Amino acid sequence: MAYIYALIFAIVVCMNTDVIQAEESQHDTLENVEYRLSCIPKGGECERMADPCCPGLQCLGGNPFNKENFGKCKCQ
């Protein structure tokens, strides 16, 4: 009989743990979506290395020796 109670208790604990983990992963997903919406996509103009290009991209370009191209960087 104790075995059955222990089994039921283990199932309930596992179900509650899964619900908590699902809520945390959903929260992380919402944060990631907000970040992706605010980041600069590939080919988008940026001004400096610290600008928030999307993951895997960097703010590159802009030739300081060319007056026409100075400060025109893009997320690549």
From Swiss-Prot:
Cellular location(s): Secreted
Post-translational modification: Contains 3 disulfide bonds.
Top-level taxon of the source organism: Eukaryota
Keywords for the protein's UniProt record, in alphabetical order: Calcium channel impairing toxin, Disulfide bond, Ion channel impairing toxin, Neurotoxin, Secreted, Signal, Toxin, Voltage-gated calcium channel impairing toxin
Molecular-function GO terms, alphabetical: calcium channel regulator activity; toxin activity
Keyword Secreted tagged: yes
Function of the protein: Inhibits voltage-gated calcium channel (Cav) currents.
Protein family (similarity comment): Belongs to the scoloptoxin-13 family.
UniProt-recorded name of the protein: Omega-scoloptoxin(13)-Ssm2b
Organism name: Scolopendra mutilans (Chinese red-headed centipede)
Higher taxonomy: Eukaryota, Metazoa, Ecdysozoa, Arthropoda, Myriapoda
